[in-house]
């Protein structure tokens, strides 16, 4: 299974049934990775805070989408479902805008599925048209999805996941990607995110 199939299935499965435990863990993981990556890129503290918040909340729009496709059989209506799924970035941005979040955070959430080569969504933006915060979250979101357990597959180990990211490097800003590579090779961020994704977190795991 290639990266495109993994991430597509991840988005569909997430929207069929939003598990708040998993959603919070994924948001925490993306937040940690994004803030560390912003630091690696030399961003200032204010920007690092914004990208950490946006990373935590980047998938909030999925909470509005899941009721529309909940209960449908997974082998039917895939095209329609993907159209719903692709609304989540804009819906998330709309939610945060209504709640008064900083516009930079709103934009990071809105554009976090845009690809550097213009193949992303919702607007097929390319290159530096995409805000740098969204470019940061993009690579962190993909990596986090790959190292997370899903109902249809086990998590990939970090080395395998990074290899899959390399295979799709055209989707990412090369400056951001190279900083991401340095970060995961020289810091403890993988251990920290592994705990967030798979460890026991007081309060989160309590039923």
Where are these predicted regions, by residue range?
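Histidine- and acidic-residue-rich, metal-dependent catalytic cores
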Residues: 1-207
